[in-house]
Amino acid sequence: MQRLMKRKLAVIVILGSIVVLLAVRLASPSFEVGPEPFQIAREPNISPEYSGVVIPGNIAPMNFKILEEGQAYCARIHSADGPAIEVASRTGQIRIPLRKWRALIQTNKGRSLFVDVYVRNAENEWLQFQRIVNTIAKEDIDRTLVYRFMRPVYNAWKEMGIYQRDLTDFDVSLVMNGRSFGEGCLNCHSFAGDASETMTIGLRSPIYGSSTLLARKGEVHKIGAKWGYTAWHPSGRLAVYSINKVRQFFHAAGLEVRDVVDLDSALLCYHVEAKKVVSPEELADKNRLETYPTWSPDGLYLYFCSGPILWKDRNTVPPANYDKLKYDLCRISYDVETDQWGKAETVLSADETGSSIMLPRISPDGRFLLFCMCRYGCFPVYQPSSDLYLMDLATGKYHKLAINSRYSESWHSWSGNSRWIAFSSKRQGGSLTRTYLAYVDQTGQAYRPFVLPQKDPTYYDSLLETFSVPELIAGSVKVSKSVLARTARSEASVAVDIPITGATPKAGPSEPWLERE
């Protein structure tokens, strides 16, 4: 009896092994290209367009699909050292094994990465396309990208969340979802530099009201006021944030029919240990709109955007002259030891540029200031004219980056080593925001960007959600989503006295115009 059972077990094991081998064989086809394929004098059409780009040596596999008619497909990925990676496909989808990819790109930092593409046509002939050449940078990118993921906002939202993605692979985890606190809205996530230990998230809920979650030193507290765009002082002692009266409206026609106006705004300063909010006079001028704060890495200057209020009625939407409003780039000195502010000064004026200056962010080495400029207003993601510019802070000279498209480029952040930027772009058709990564060298030259790699190379083809506000951080968000949600629902909060009146009412799904996409 035992012998019979052993024989049956052996047969089952053998059959199981055969099934597994067949499955692997079917999933990973192998084709013999032949010694002399016909040469095609152009690069293959692939999606995403991972060609002529500079990539980090720690990025996830850059899977792609070959958009050429054929019966079979092969890709050979190789560099100066190490074994080549060969991937065969019946569909044109090239999914690169993670371990082999890591070994290849980490071994060849600073060198070229070659991709040879072969396609077998209906006549059973193999075609070889012109080689794709990319470059592996010597510098890695911060490991984690934190972003907001949601459908485009018109008149309502259903669901939104903040997620974090490990850029070295395809792992994605939820930081917090609006469903966890009464279908609320969450945005304006920010960090102290590229570290994940200090994080804030702005919340609005029809049930729980408006507040801000502050995660710091392993604890999470709820502050009884909603922060807008936030900038942490490098010391971690204080944060400057905006309060904004943002409203959305619509145009009858255009490449982008949505528009946003900030009817009133100011900058406030929150002192962490004292749990106190102050309003420096230079940052809350009643005749101007202050927004988008960012600190210099040494903490000596706060940079921000400031524009004149061109309307008397601060409730009408859209207000008079909304399309004539242009913001200047300003800065103000600060002494953290004495808590003393200097006088605000203009770094770059809208009169000089002819455009509205938005979203300043300084590289961690203090050398460059990355910012957006658009025709008017404060919301570049809704402005097709919005482009990225880079200022050399040593000289004050700035230039338009070559990586711009005909569509909107907007939210952006720096990697901790000042060599990489993540930014939002609508270049895939003008409607949906995607995250792109680009290398910036020591002279300020930016190289051709590439869209955030996905495990499925066709991922973006049918995706209707947007990736927004990409923040690069070195580590990862450790605080759990359950702790964040529980704190958001809690009645306990840190009470703060706001020295000036804000404009952030409770909001439900019918009021998306109070937020940013």
Question: Residue spans of the language-model regions?
Answer:
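Hydrophobic membrane-insertion alpha-helices, especially the h-region
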Residues: 12-25
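Sequence signature of WD/YWTD-type beta-propeller architectures
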Residues: 26-517
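N-terminal Sec-pathway targeting helices
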Residues: 2-15
